[in-house]
Amino acid sequence: MKLKNSLWAKLQLRFPNLSFYAAKKEANNKTESLAGSVVDKRVPVFKPLILLLPAIFVLTLFTIIPFFLNIKYAFTYEKSPGHPSTTTFTMDGFKNVFESPTFGVAVRNSIMYGLIVLPFVMAISLIISSCIATAYRKWARGIWQTIFFLPYITNIVAVSLSFIQFFSTFGMFNSMFHIQVSWLETGDIYSFRPLLPMIIQGVWSGLAFNILISTTAMLSVDKNLYKSASIDGIGGIKQFFHITLPSIKSTTTFLITMGIIGGIKVFPLALFNNKPSDAISNGASTLMLFIYERTNVGSGAVQVASAAAICLFIIGILYSTLIRGGFGTIMKVSTNYGENYVWNKIKNSEVMNEYQAKKK
């Protein structure tokens, strides 16, 4: 190494411009970064549009067009099917939806499912992710992440069959508590009992994705923050609430949004042998299940299903606004509490008292 350095020094003395040419050649050999090649260069408008065309086509065909067709079918009715000239404006679809007793049960179950499952999934996944992220050895983190991710890739039919057996009248759940309750075969459309299997299955299946994303986010938090907090004598619980949670706020917001969408769109058909009539007659109706079942009910079915879909859209927006606002308020209060706590500590510290005394 010393020989190379001395040789390079002699060459530089003999050829003063050697360093300049070497640096220039090295710069020319470097590959251009993505930011420099795409962002900083003028690109014709049609090039990015060509790349976006497949996505735009799929989005238009399967989302935008069906959305407007759904609005059309919800407010119109063809007196003679196949003859557009007989189409008239009507609100009968919404009338049939609101008069249906199963629609109220569907709204009740969907909202209760979302309100219970989302907080449990978020709380449990954050706790487990925190334990995995603090694991000392990297191979242990990988093993635990793989174990907790297995429910996400497990076949939903196999999972549903397992839950059907688990919650049957003579299943394992009843055996553990020495009871005989028909959780999935109540015979009552207003029953609350099917909610328990639905909620437990929802929590179990929702943990996998949340744990994977939360663990990845926690591992990306700057470790120097934890070291500084440990030096100041801050415990692990306070570090979690005042360092970890604020640092993964964007990830938490994403998971809450996905949880809200999944909660309002719960579809427990597999728990009832893929028979929507069985699910509805046993009190397990949800908004998605109600819409699915109404599309197969004869004349005017599409109109009623379209009206129910619009109701689902409106309920989803209101539900999302309330839940996101609630979680946002909790995070804001927690952050403000932490800031006030630190500021009060600083104000009451000996250093601050000495500074104030000198200032006077």
Give the role of each language-model region.
Residues A357-K360:
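Short, charged juxtamembrane terminal tails flanking transmembrane helices
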Residues P44-Y355:
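A structural signal for multi-pass alpha-helical bundles of membrane permease subunits
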Residues M1-R42:
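Short, Lys/Arg-rich, polar N-terminal cytosolic tail immediately upstream
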